[in-house]
A protein has these predicted regions:
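Intrinsically disordered, metal-sensing/regulatory segments
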Residues: 1-229
């Protein structure tokens, strides 16, 4: 994922990129939208709720955490995409995307379903490449120097693997910290639902039957994994 993110951002820092995306990339993005929605609703949120209920929590904390995460990430994005060449919107965008990546990585590290991990990993590769490309454009269009923009971009790139490490550590310490893993899964559910809704809104108006069906295929794939995994 780190290599994909760096490769996606590199052309932006070297030259002025074209804004056109290939049809394959757009279809993969639409497929990822369905995968993220399925991961959040079918896998992570139920697993989080089961974890809380196992340890006697009667209040619906997983759903509160999930909803707050969705609204918090949406707020970060509204603050991030300001107007003008000021550095503040660019830094806010970097924080928002890094938060996305870190929470997604933590959820991936805490997930115990092997088949779901593989599908999510592939979907995150596509998403992280697109996010890295977008952030690089925002940073290079801002008033930040090239050196500072590359430092901020690097911080975004390492956010996801750091999240994976946190999620894996939390899973290994489940007996000592029983509610950490369910909390990470609830945060991850909110993050992936936000990913999915965000990407689905983008692709819903796209032309072509493949892009219209791709989110449904991604969602159906995650539903099937819930049966067999």
């Amino acid at each position: 994922m780190v290599v994909v993110a760096m490769a996606a951002a590199a052309p932006v820092f070297r030259t002025t990129p074209s804004s056109r995306r290939s049809a394959v990339a757009a279809t993969a993005d639409a497929l990822a939208a369905g995968i993220f929605l399925g991961a959040g609703l079918i896998h992570m949120l139920p697993d989080s709720a089961q974890g809380y209920w196992t340890y006697g929590a009667s209040y619906p904390w997983p759903f509160v955490i999930c909803g707050a995460t969705i609204m918090g990430l949406a707020l970060l994005e509204r603050l991030a995409w300001g107007s003008g060449r000021s550095a503040a919107p660019a830094l806010a965008a970097a924080i928002a995307l890094a938060a996305h990546s870190f929470l997604a990585g933590a959820a991936l590290g805490a997930t115990s379903r092997q088949a779901a991990i593989l599908v999510l990993f592939l979907a995150l590769i596509a998403h992280k490449g697109a996010a890295s490309f977008s952030l690089a454009q925002i940073l290079t269009d801002s008033s930040l120097s090239r050196r500072r923009a590359m430092i901020v971009q690097s911080a975004f790139v390492v956010a996801l693997p750091l999240g994976v490490v946190l999620g894996a550590v939390a899973t290994r310490q489940e007996q000592a910290w029983p509610l950490v893993k369910p909390t990470i899964l609830a945060l991850g559910a909110g993050t992936f639902l936000h990913f999915g809704m965000q990407r689905h809104r983008t692709t819903a108006q796209a032309l072509g039957i493949a892009r219209q069906l791709a989110p449904w295929c991604g969602f159906a794939l995650m539903a099937l994994i819930a049966i067999v995994d």
